[in-house]
Amino acid sequence: MSLKITEECTFCAACEPECPVNAISAGSDIYVIDESACTECEGYADSPACVAVCPAECIVKA
């Protein structure tokens, strides 16, 4: 299970501080999710926190 950030990312940075496992970081043009680290917030929240705060709705299942 993992998520990814699509090219629609606006580089707003809302998602990065929401990740409890620090799987989100700034790429060159968009934020990226380390798919090997992403847990979709299992054990931390009922649903992925980054998805809830993304204004561009660009965080999807990998």
UniProtKB/Swiss-Prot annotation:
One annotated GO molecular function: 4 iron, 4 sulfur cluster binding
Required cofactor names: [4Fe-4S] cluster
UniProt-listed InterPro entries: 4Fe4S_Fe-S-bd, 4Fe4S_Fe_S_CS
Domain 4Fe-4S ferredoxin-type per the UniProt entry, residue ranges: 2-28, 29-62
Pfam families recorded: Fer4 (PF00037)
Residue positions binding [4Fe-4S] cluster 1: C9, C12, C15, C54
Stated name of the protein: Ferredoxin-3
Lineage summary: Bacteria, Pseudomonadati, Chlorobiota, Chlorobiia, Chlorobiales
